[in-house]
Amino acid sequence: MLSRSSGYKRAFLRRTVLETRKDMMSEQVSVSKSNIRGAFGAFFIPGMYTALWAGFVPYLKAKLSIGEDVLGSMILLLGVGSCLSMAIAGKLVESFGCKRVVLLASFIGMLSLAIVTMCSTIVTTTIALFFFGIGVGLSGASANLQAILTEKVSKKHLMGAYHGGWSLGGFAGAGVLLVLLKILSLPVNESIWGLLIILFIAMIAISQFMLTFGRDPNAKVMKKSKSPLSFHPIAIIFGLLSFVSYLVEGAVGDWSALYLFEDKGIVIQEAVMGVMLFNGTMCIGRLLGNTIGKHVTSKQVVVGGYLLGAIAMALIVFLPGHASMYTYLLLGISLAMVVPNLFSAMGEQNVIPMTQAVATSTMLGYMGILMGP
């Protein structure tokens, strides 16, 4: 029995290595439209299920009868889970292939979110949120590695559109949840469960078109590192720049619905519109970003985006009611192309392995989520 198990393991590893070598030989690999769409799905579907979490936050707070301090501590552990999973995401992708990690991440994230909706105590909800964070972190890191690989093989600039897929998923998820809750008056738990089942089935189908990723091609000419992370200045700089953008995106995802409901007087069924508008304009900006990028530099995109974002956040605080809610449109468009520009640059540099660059930068970036609560 042990011999048979070892044989299965060797066969699995051999198949993974062969698939990896095939995909990483860029001269022999052709990227079809289906492959490009598969990578897009790795962003779109996680964007959708994370938007469902954003819409559920006010209901969770009311169900558990907790204050913002307790809720903030619970969301803090969500961020911890994300950071921990991102730290090992690169090694998991190298060992098992990006497609398998994408599926694993979706399963963990969606199952954990379903459990969150069923929990009735602070302890169980916090544990479920920790695992939800693990799923979200793995989803983000593995999706970005899939996108970088697809860009390298196809030699096309796709990162803006891929990150637009996450925002489009967030817009769609918030929009569908809004329809189910406000127009159809369906229960929130059942609405989220039904959507999660559909999304996971869709992810299984779409994953069949993803490229298999195993190792950074730079590893052939560089000393192999056993560490999943890199503390090279390049990775640190990328991480710190990502930190600011993730801080804002995390705050909008976790707090915007509750903020609009409690501080701006928006009815609870409409409170999810803040994240919907934010994701909608961010999606448009990212889908059009590759065209805009031909006329401006990456530095101008990053600096200009952060300045405009600061103005938008100030307006959200000081404007009343629906005016504050609609300002999320400006916030979304201002930050749209900041992170895509950073990840494209990670794929283009040849100083450190791609998996280390992405794992380190995304982990440091998601520290922004830890700082938000």
What are these language model-derived features?
Residues 86-116, 123:
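Conserved MFS/SLC helix-loop-helix module at the cytosolic interface between two early adjacent transmembrane helices
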Residues 65, 97, 118-123, 318-320:
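Helix-breaking motifs and short loop linkers at transmembrane-helix boundaries and internal kinks
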Residues 132-164:
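Cytoplasmic helix-loop-helix junction between adjacent transmembrane helices
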Residues 107-120, 308-319:
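C-terminal ends and interior cores of transmembrane alpha-helices
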Residues 299-342:
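C-terminal transmembrane helical hairpin of 12-TM major facilitator-type secondary transporters
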Residues 190-208:
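Symmetry-related core transmembrane helices of the 12-TM Major Facilitator Superfamily/SLC fold
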Residues 85-97, 181, 285-297:
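Helix-to-loop junctions at the C-terminal end of transmembrane segments
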Residues 55-69, 254-270:
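Short amphipathic helix-loop junctions that connect adjacent transmembrane helices
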